[in-house]
Curated annotation (Swiss-Prot):
Topology relative to the membrane: Single-pass type I membrane protein
Job description of the protein: TRAP proteins are part of a complex whose function is to bind calcium to the ER membrane and thereby regulate the retention of ER resident proteins.
Official protein name in the record: Translocon-associated protein subunit beta
InterPro entries assigned to the protein according to its UniProt record, in alphabetical order: TRAP_beta
Keyword S-adenosyl-L-methionine: no
Amino acid sequence: MRLLAFAVLALFAVTQAEEGARLLASKSLLNRYAVEGRDLTLQYNIYNVGSSAALDVELSDDSFPPEDFGIVSGMLNVKWDRIAPASNVSHTVVLRPLKAGYFNFTSATVTYLAQEDGPVVIGFTSAPGQGGILAQREFDRRFSPHFLDWAAFGVMTLPSIGVPLLLWYSSKRKYDTPKTKKN
């Protein structure tokens, strides 16, 4: 009986300790390939899985230096007054990589108040990890339709196909002419 009472008391203490807001945050790249000089779309998702609203939520991502990335639209530092329990918010930023090479996409920082008079809670988003930013020339070489290359290939193969065809056609015309009947 004492063990059962202790278990109920411990369970009650755990549920009381978990009151308040609890945020889960993710950061993801929406592009399949990151290319120098082309738009790179980042999406931040923040989920409140707690029992109360998260207050003064601030998302801050300092992992994109201005000398390597230009901001096309959106902001890397965003603030929400509150995020209701069992709800989520999404934020999208469009960046333009200015240099090619490998880049470490690290996590962003999320700070919030779990309860109105509680301490500031600091959390981090998921980190996409290291990724390569392709040079524009390399991307075009790999993924362009190569119309000029195919046209050059066609012009170069034309003599090897056309000359035998012309020889065959001239001999066919020479020997296949029907003889006219004399009346």
